[in-house]
Amino acid sequence: MQAPLRSHFALTLVALATSAFTSTVAAHNVPLGEEGFVRYNFTANYGVAKRLEAPDAAMASPAAADPLYVGKINANDGDLNFKKGALINNRVSLLGEVDARYSANQGVFLRAQAFYDAAYHGRTDNNAAFPNTDNHASNAAEFARGTRRAAGGEAEFLDAYWYGDFKTGDESALNVKVGRHVVQWGESLFFANIAGAQSPVDVNKINVPGAQVKDFLLPVGQVSVNYSLNPKWTVMGYAQYEFREAKLPAAGSFWSVADFLGPGAERFLFAPGFGLSRGNDIKPSAGGQWGLGARY
């Protein structure tokens, strides 16, 4: 299974031409009473990416005698759906943020986004030598319904939380957040470590031209506390009351490396036209995720 996945990445990482344009549509700060304010910001982004090389023939039509045959036919829809010169992204997105502080130290923060990617609303370029080697039940020349929905456009609320900043002493202060937000205590260069467990990631957005870090970290419903004892010591903790899964590349989308995983995935193939249908995901309970930390 690993060989075809590596081949797919090796091809796609060097075979793209991308362009992105980002513009702040509106940004204002409106006074609210004597101490409060409402600050809002809307950012529009347009990104386009094009495939510059043809799909690898070994992945497109693997020989039945190939020992990696089953692995390849379950990892090639993202390759076959985009021919040389095809747009893999033609995406416009809008990100809106509203910070409403109703007193000197308390407020509500909201963030929402919407996008539309025309590349996933047309026909695919899937013309494999063998029929029925695509991993969804509809026509191979069409993206699966779940793929169109996840990669082609959606609108959703991201952050929605209350926050408060409280002075507790000459050098100490308490910050509290309640609601859906991101907690990230640290990160490393090559490995996510604790940050990878605290916040799920929307993998699709990492590969979108013009995407920013705040675009692909998924907020989670939780209560978090940051207590600065003095300028040197800080203790912190959080407890999550919501489970959110990471968003994998949609099956058949360009960056997908497993046709049976992610939105739009419908079956695992053993041979052209023969396989197992994919069932619903089994989700864990919403509780049990918490953490305590200290920083010096």
Task: Walk through the language-model features, giving the residues of each.
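Cleaved targeting-peptide boundary
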Residues: T24-F37, L174-N175
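Flexible glycine-rich, low-complexity coil/linker segments exposed to the extracellular/periplasmic environment
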Residues: D56-L80, A250, F254-S256, F260-G287
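Extracellular loop and loop/strand-boundary signature of outer-membrane beta-barrel proteins
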Residues: D79-K84, A144-R149, N207-A211, G275-N280
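Outer membrane beta-barrel
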Residues: A104-D259
